[in-house]
């Protein structure tokens, strides 16, 4: 009985380790949750963030235009 309980504990610990590793990869997802958009006077495509008042930080956005209630953010 003790061996079976120990085996269950080992399997549970391994499952927790692999689940935590998978969550770390999910934090650094290679895609943005934004749709493509275009602003007048801008030749490139921007990122449309829905129901946001400002562009989110960490993506290198330098300019934007409002498309109420959304915002189109440009990285250049």
Swiss-Prot record:
Tissue distribution: Moderately expressed in the ectodermal tissue from the distal and proximal tentacles, body wall, and oral disk.
Entry GO terms, CC: extracellular region; nematocyst
UniProt xrefs under InterPro entries: BDS_K_chnl_tox, Myo_ane_neurotoxin_sf
Pfam families: Defensin_4
Record keywords, A-Z: Cleavage on pair of basic residues, Disulfide bond, Hypotensive agent, Ion channel impairing toxin, Nematocyst, Neurotoxin, Potassium channel impairing toxin, Secreted, Signal, Toxin, Voltage-gated potassium channel impairing toxin
Disulfide bridges in this chain: 37-72, 39-65, 55-73
Subcellular location(s) of the protein: Secreted; Nematocyst
Residues spanning the signal sequence: 1-19
An example Gene Ontology biological process: regulation of blood pressure
GO molecular function: ion channel inhibitor activity; potassium channel regulator activity; toxin activity
Propeptide residues per the UniProt entry: 20-31
Family per similarity comment: Belongs to the sea anemone type 3 (BDS) potassium channel toxin family.
Function: Blocks Kv3 voltage-gated potassium channels. Reduces blood pressure.
Protein name: Kappa-actitoxin-Avd4c
Upper lineage: Eukaryota, Metazoa, Cnidaria, Anthozoa, Hexacorallia
């Amino acid at each position: 009985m003790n061996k079976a309980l120990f085996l269950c504990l080992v399997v549970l610990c391994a499952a927790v380790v692999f689940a935590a590793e998978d969550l770390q990869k999910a934090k650094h997802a290679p895609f943005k949750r934004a749709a493509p958009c275009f602003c007048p006077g801008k030749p490139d495509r921007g990122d449309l963030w829905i129901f946001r008042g400002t562009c989110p930080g960490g993506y290198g956005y330098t300019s934007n235009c409002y498309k109420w209630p959304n915002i189109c953010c440009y990285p250049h």
